[in-house]
Amino acid sequence: MTRRNNPELNDEREPIDKIKASIDLKKKTIRRNKRKRRLIKMLQFLIVIGVLIGIYYFDKSDASRVHNVRVNGNVILSDAEIKDALNIHENQRIYLTFKPFINHKGKKVKGIDNIDANVYYRQGIINLNVTEKKAVGYTLEPSIRIYFEDGFYKELETLNPSVIERLPLLVGFTEESISESLLSALATIDDGSMASVSEIHFEPTKVEPDYMRIVMNNDYFVFTNVETLPQLNKYATIISGADSNARCIEFIEYGPTEETQSAVVKACGS
């Protein structure tokens, strides 16, 4: 006999089968998503490991290092002094070296006015274009020192004629008398007038504790204090109309401005 399906039972099983199929599909989807997430995490982990390994080997390679530091424009400060002040040396990691940081740090170095750095990462080269502060004088005693306008000085073991050829020799000064105001006043003197100065002797008096006698290289003498020292910029004009026998020039101050200052040219000893 042929067995007949009960339509009512079939109708009851259909929703159950659909629910079961839906549950199975969801389980498969969840398992598939889990596998996908695990795969993505594994790929991310491998990428991170690969990047770290790449960074490690790059850091160990010559390509990551500074091969050459070139210092240009410095006259008095040595290459080594500038490198040490900036903490930049060969064989350092060049990818940790940035131009803005070098330029900013350079402004804080004594004796340096400005640094314009260029970093060539592929070649491993750092160029330091240096502008020094203006040098305004030098001493021989108690030691050889070159003084800059910002108050910084550099000591030298031996005298370099090319460095001091246009600088005045400071004679009789103590560390206290080489004040910031003196160095600032010397910095205002133009190069042409400064080149005419041979020596500056510190000869204080009771009335003027910062009095100086300046020996010019054309047999003239200038007497001044710190306040009137900038009048030396008018030196060429002053002597152009002076009597050839009048070799002593005294800067006189009537007030705090250049308009209230004057120069008297007279025979020495008069």
From Swiss-Prot:
Residues 64-135 form the POTRA domain. Residues 60-270 are extracellular. The keyword tRNA processing does not apply. It is found in: Cell membrane. Signal peptide: none annotated. InterPro entries: DivIB (IPR026580), FtsQ_DivIB (IPR050487), POTRA (IPR034746). Keywords: Cell cycle, Cell division, Cell membrane, Membrane, Transmembrane, Transmembrane helix. The chain crosses the membrane at residues 39-59. It is a single-pass type II membrane protein. PANTHER family: CELL DIVISION PROTEIN DIVIB (PTHR37820), CELL DIVISION PROTEIN FTSQ (PTHR37820:SF1). This is Cell division protein DivIB. It comes from Erysipelothrix rhusiopathiae (strain Fujisawa). The gene is divIB.
